[in-house]
Amino acid sequence: MENKVDILRVLDGDTVDVLFKFPFGIQVKKRVRLFGINAPETRTRNLEEKRKGILAKERLSELLKEAKMKCILVYHGDGKFGRPLGELFVDGVNINLVLVSEGHSVPY
């Protein structure tokens, strides 16, 4: 299921807060984990992983900054912690795959 979303916040390289927009002016805020990828953690004592996690977060923020109005999230169910899982598209480009292809995340 595709939904138009506004990106509210990038938490790390594979998690974003979004505002889902539904008909009749209904809007819902949710924390979404990007489906099928895993980025290094930003909250860790491992300094190398933290550095890579910060780079992944910055790259995701950069990819989303210019295209907030054209974001589509394809919902893939809920993850093991109850968060929605989704593929994020900006102007038709799959952001999940961009992060993997650039080495900021790995397939999961």
Predicted regions and their residues:
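Small beta-barrel nucleic-acid-binding modules, primarily SNase/OB-fold domains
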Residues: 1-108
